[in-house]
Every structure is written in structure tokens, then in C-alpha cells.
């Protein structure tokens, strides 16, 4: 932080207020950078939608269409819209000379594409940093255009797919290096070992960073340097890229719901496609210098808002949007438009009408001719509504019905009336069905009530009978209890009389009862002992059986051990024999090596002798011809 500069200079006012702009403080590492559109891109987007007008209505309002044709048409519309959002040149499917891309093309690319203008401003900031930048885009012409744009920056370009558009590049080395990687690759892409990425820029916002070839690069950077590389997705606001980026978070890209939501939003939002909100315009007017602080410290929160939410539009919204003509202006500032329109109104001649001689648009002609999808026979309003316009109402004819002009207001009014009538018919049919159901339910409840009443009467009568029986049983038990008490009293009297006659009779009677109780206890214990003895006998039998099985298993194991020992002994004998054979072979090889060494030494001695002989030989010298004289042999030296 330069404190002297801060204290010596006046404070710079903030470009925008982050609180009013809706900055959420995102630090996820995957950020969205909205981009505008130029006027040509907006008009091309509207033309693409107009080309697929009938297929869009079939896709959203009917279900009896040929799925392969209409679905392919919708996918073609989405693809062309994506190409236009990136750059209009991508619609050219014939050969484009690569030499054309190198002739002052960076400026022209930025003029005809809002996204490339944002990329140019962003790369002008990134090129000031000594870091490696990864740019991911579609392969082919998109990468050619991106490389042509980067030729206007002071960066080193490393293209990892296809052939570079400029084969003879200068040897100048810059601090910033850009790696161009395709969004779809058949094989993994390997960067240099010392490459340390500082930023990833996705020109195609639908790039899946979880793709194997991209994930391998990012995972390698995270393993090597222990940090996540931040990713910036450049997407045109309110375009198909914006819709795909928003709906791709919650829906699978291969489902019908995803295609329906993206197509509907693209059609409805085409009147505001590429139009930045007022809060963001100062940032882009100053060439994205608002992002310098974040580029200095990428760990800081992203200073721009998150992806703006996109509404889920219905088929009615799509049809209403298709019936509305879209007009674009070169200037997006509403205040300046107001001043411009005011000046035009002041200079307008008084004799000129409101409409002037402006030509009737395509959609107005379709409405005037009653040629729209809900009226395939082109019938007038009298036939459609069944209301005759021959009768007068308060002395005047109904203008809308008599004119035969189908306006938006009349269409909406008729549609709302038909919708209300349909809802009322559905409600009446529902009430009729409910009335029949209620009658059937009432009859069933009535039958159930009679059944329950009958069951209740039976239960009450049964309860009364049971109460009577209980009273009788209680009375009988009480009588028997009284009889027992009388008998016990008689027995005690008799025992007293017998005890009076015979001394000790009562004591004998008590001893007899006690002996009987003791005998019963002994019998119970004896039965328990017998059960325990039988259980122990069974356990002994099981134990003997288990011991016999264990002995058999032990015998079998001993046999297996003896067999294994015999096999081991055989293997040892075989190993000894093989070892002896190997020793003999190694000895033979050592003898051969010794012989060959002796032969090599002999050859070396011969070679030394030959070299000495060659050194002793004298060679003649020859003078090179000079000054036009012939060379002469001077003999040997």
C-alpha cells in the first residue's frame, strides 16, 4: 500500500457502490463476468428467432409435431444464438483465410462483438501480470478468432489444439502467457511442468470444468501449488449464454425442461439481450479497471454481482413475445434517448402525422390478415366468436368486431373470456361429478350407520346376558363358599371331638398333611434330577461324537502334513538339481567370457600395432592453387 500517494493526492471516488449493485461477496472461485452486445448481434439474434418462428410455436403450444424435425430446429436455433453471442463471424461456415485474421483484426473483432470487447479490456489488464492464463473456448474458428484477438496484446500465445493462425511469430518474450485449450478434447492436454496457472477464462460459459482434460490441469495445479485457480465465465447478459448458465445449475442439460426453459427465456428476453444494467455501465466504460484490485489479490471476494436469476416463462409469454416486434437502437442510455427524441419532436413539421409513412411491420400484416397460429382458416371475428355485427349497440357498431382487425388487446380479451368459460365449465362438471360422488358417499354412510346400530344393539343384548350369567356365577360361588365354611367348621368340631376321645389325633392329622407336602416336594425334585440326568447323558453323547470327529480330523491333518513334507522334499531335490545345472552353465559362460576377453585383448594388441604402423607412414602435402598458378608437388616432407 502506497501511503504517501494516498495522503498526497485527493481521494478517488468509487466507480460504483457495491451495496446497491448487489455484490454477495462470492469466494467460490467460479465467477460470472457479464458482457454486452453490439447492435448487429442483437439484430442477428432477433432474425434467428424469426427464422424458427413456426417451429417455436409448434414446440411450445402443440404436441403432435414431428419430434426429430422440430427438436433439431430448436437445437439449431440455440446453437446459432450461442455463436452470435460469441461473435457474428462464427456463423460463416465456409473457408475463412487465416491471413485475413492477422490484418489489424483485433480492433475489428472488438467492434463487432461485445464479448470480444470485454475480453480485450480484460486481457489488457491481465497482460500486466507475470502469470499463466488458461483460456477455454470452442475448438475451430472460435479458437482462431480468440488467437487473432490475443495477437493485439503483449502476451505469449500457446495453442494446444489445431494449428496456429500465425506460424511466424516474433521471438519477443512477454511476462504473461496465454494457453488456448478447447472446451471439448478427445485426449488429455499436458502443460509444461513449470507452468503455474493464475487465472482461467471461459469464453464459452457452458464449459464444464469437470471435463477430464480440464480437470487434470486444474487438479495438477492444486496438487502442486495447493490453491484453487479462479475461473471467470464471460457470458452475454440476457442472452442464451446467461439462460444456460442459470438453468444449468439446477437442470440437466440433456432434459426437455432445460431446453424449454432456455428457449423460452431466450425468445422473451431478446428485446433486452446484451443490455447492461445502469449500475454496471460505469465499470465497462472505464475498461474494467474496477477489477484491478481483485486481480492483485484473487483471494478477495468477487466485486461483481452473481448470475442474475432468469424467470421461468410459459408458452403464453413466448407467443406474446413472438407477436411483438422488437426494435433496437444504437444507444442504450435511456436518458440520452429521451433527449434525442425530444430534439426530433421539436424539429418535426406540423403537417406530419404521428405515424407518417412508416411501413407496416411483418407481424402487423399477419394480424391484419387474420393469419396466426390460433386461426389456421383465417376466419374473421364474426365466425370465430359467433357474434354478428349486423345489430347495433346503442346506435353504434362494435368497432373491433366490425373492423376485422385482430389486435393484441382483443386477442387477450377473447383468450381470457374463453379461459374463464373453460374454467367455469370445468368447475360445473366438477360440481356435477362431486354431487354424484356425494350421493354415493351418503348412501354408503347410511348403510354403515344402520350396520353399526345393529351391531350396537347386539352388543348391548349380549352384555345384558353376560351380566346375568356373571350374577348367577357369583351367587353360586358365594353359596359354595358358605358351604365350605360350614364343612370346615364341622371338620374342626369333629377333630376336636376325636382329640377329646383319643389323645394326639389332631397332632397326627397335622403330621400327615405335612408329610404329604414333603413327599410332593421330593417328587418334584426327583423329576428335576431325572431331567438333568437325561440332559447330561445327551451332552456326553454329543461330546463323545465331537471327540471322535476331532480325532478323525487330526488323523487327516497328519496325513496332509506328511504328504506336504514329501512334496517339499521332492521340490528341494529338484531345486538342487536345477542349481547344479545353473552352476554348470554359469561356469561354461565364465569360460566363454574369459576366452572372449583374451580374444579382445589380442585384437586390441593387433589394433595398437596397426596404429603404430600407420603413424610411421609419411603422407605427401599438396599446395592449394593461388593467383592462377598450378599446384606443384614438392615431394615428401
From Swiss-Prot:
Got a GO cellular component term for this one? cytosol
The residues forming a coiled coil are 443-608
Upper lineage: Eukaryota, Fungi, Dikarya, Ascomycota, Saccharomycotina
Q: What is the protein's name according to its record?
A: HDA1 complex subunit 3
Keywords, comma-separated and alphabetical: Chromatin regulator, Coiled coil, Nucleus, Repressor, Transcription, Transcription regulation
- Recorded source organism is Eremothecium gossypii (strain ATCC 10895 / CBS 109.51 / FGSC 9923 / NRRL Y-1056)
Q: Where are the transmembrane segments?
A: none
Positions with biased composition (Polar residues): 618-628
Q: List the disulfide bonds.
A: none
For region Disordered, the annotated ranges are 618-637
Please indicate which superkingdom the organism of origin belongs to: Eukaryota
In the record, the note on similarity to other proteins reads: Belongs to the HDA2/3 family. HDA3 subfamily.
What are this entry's molecular-function GO terms?
A: chromatin binding; DNA binding; histone deacetylase activity; nucleosome array spacer activity
Amino acid at each position: 500500500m502506497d501511503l504517501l500517494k494516498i495522503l498526497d493526492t485527493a481521494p478517488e471516488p468509487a466507480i460504483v457502490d457495491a451495496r446497491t449493485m448487489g455484490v454477495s461477496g462470492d469466494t467460490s472461485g467460479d465467477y460470472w463476468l457479464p458482457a454486452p452486445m453490439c447492435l448487429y448481434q442483437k439484430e442477428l439474434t432477433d432474425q434467428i428467432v424469426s427464422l424458427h418462428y413456426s417451429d417455436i410455436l409448434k414446440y411450445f403450444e402443440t404436441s403432435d409435431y414431428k419430434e426429430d424435425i422440430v427438436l433439431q430446429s430448436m437445437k439449431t436455433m440455440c446453437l446459432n444464438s450461442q455463436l452470435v453471442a460469441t461473435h457474428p463471424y462464427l456463423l460463416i461456415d465456409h473457408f475463412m483465410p487465416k491471413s485475413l485474421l492477422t490484418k489489424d483484426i483485433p480492433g475489428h473483432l472488438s467492434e463487432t462483438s461485445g464479448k470480444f470487447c470485454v475480453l480485450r479490456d480484460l486481457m489488457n489488464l491481465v497482460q500486466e501480470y507475470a502469470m499463466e492464463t488458461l483460456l477455454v473456448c470452442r475448438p475451430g474458428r472460435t479458437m482462431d478468432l480468440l488467437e487473432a484477438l490475443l495477437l493485439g496484446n503483449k502476451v505469449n500465445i500457446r495453442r494446444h489444439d489445431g494449428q496456429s493462425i500465425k506460424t511466424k511469430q516474433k521471438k519477443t518474450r512477454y511476462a504473461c502467457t496465454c494457453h488456448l485449450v478447447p472446451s471439448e478434447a478427445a485426449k488429455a492436454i499436458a502443460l509444461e511442468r513449470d507452468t503455474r496457472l493464475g487465472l482461467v477464462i471461459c469464453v464459452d460459459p457452458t464449459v464444464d470444468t469437470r471435463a477430464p482434460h480440464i480437470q487434470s490441469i486444474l487438479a495438477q495445479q492444486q496438487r502442486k501449488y495447493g490453491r484453487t485457480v479462479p475461473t471467470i465465465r464471460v457470458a452475454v447478459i440476457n442472452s442464451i449464454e446467461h439462460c444456460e448458465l442459470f438453468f444449468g445449475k439446477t437442470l440437466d442439460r440433456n432434459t426437455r425442461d432445460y431446453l424449454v426453459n432456455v428457449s423460452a427465456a431466450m425468445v422473451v428476453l431478446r428485446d433486452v439481450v446484451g443490455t447492461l444494467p445502469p449500475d454496471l455501465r460505469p465499470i465497462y466504460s472505464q475498461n474494467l479497471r474496477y477489477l484491478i484490485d481483485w486481480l492483485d489479490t484473487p483471494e478477495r471476494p468477487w466485486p461483481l454481482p452473481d448470475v442474475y436469476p432468469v424467470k421461468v416463462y410459459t408458452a403464453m409469454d413466448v407467443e406474446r413475445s413472438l407477436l411483438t416486434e422488437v426494435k433496437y437502437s444504437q444507444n442504450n442510455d435511456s436518458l440520452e434517448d429521451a433527449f434525442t427524441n425530444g430534439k426530433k419532436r421539436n424539429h418535426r413539421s406540423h403537417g406530419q402525422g404521428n405515424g407518417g409513412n412508416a411501413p407496416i411491420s411483418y407481424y402487423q400484416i399477419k394480424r391484419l390478415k387474420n393469419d396466426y397460429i390460433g386461426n389456421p382458416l383465417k376466419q374473421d371475428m364474426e365466425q370465430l366468436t359467433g357474434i354478428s355485427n349486423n345489430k347495433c349497440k346503442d346506435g353504434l357498431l362494435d368497432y373491433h368486431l366490425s373492423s376485422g382487425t385482430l389486435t393484441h388487446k382483443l386477442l387477450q380479451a377473447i383468450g381470457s373470456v374463453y379461459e374463464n368459460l373453460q374454467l367455469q365449465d370445468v368447475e360445473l362438471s366438477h360440481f356435477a361429478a362431486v354431487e354424484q360422488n356425494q350421493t354415493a358417499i351418503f348412501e354408503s354412510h347410511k348403510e354403515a350407520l344402520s350396520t353399526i346400530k345393529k351391531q350396537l344393539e347386539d352388543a348391548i343384548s349380549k352384555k345384558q346376558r353376560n351380566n346375568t350369567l356373571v350374577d348367577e356365577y357369583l351367587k353360586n360361588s358365594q353359596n359354595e363358599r358358605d358351604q365350605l365354611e360350614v364343612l370346615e367348621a364341622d371338620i374342626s368340631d369333629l377333630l376336636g371331638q376325636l382329640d377329646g376321645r383319643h389323645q394326639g389325633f389332631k397332632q397326627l392329622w397335622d403330621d400327615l398333611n405335612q408329610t404329604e407336602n414333603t413327599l410332593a416336594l421330593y417328587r418334584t425334585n426327583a423329576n428335576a434330577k431325572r431331567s438333568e440326568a437325561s440332559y447330561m447323558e445327551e451332552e456326553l453323547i454329543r461330546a463323545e461324537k465331537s471327540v471322535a470327529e476331532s480325532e478323525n480330523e487330526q488323523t487327516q491333518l497328519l496325513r496332509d502334513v506328511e504328504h506336504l513334507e514329501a512334496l517339499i522334499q521332492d521340490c528341494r531335490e529338484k531345486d538342487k538339481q536345477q542349481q547344479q545345472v545353473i552352476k554348470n552353465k554359469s561356469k561354461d559362460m565364465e569360460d566363454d567370457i574369459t576366452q572372449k576377453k583374451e580374444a579382445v585383448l589380442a585384437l586390441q594388441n593387433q589394433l595398437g600395432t596397426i596404429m603404430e604402423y600407420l603413424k610411421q607412414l609419411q603422407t605427401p602435402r599438396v599446395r592449394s592453387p593461388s593467383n592462377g598458378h598450378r599446384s606443384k608437388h614438392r615431394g615428401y616432407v
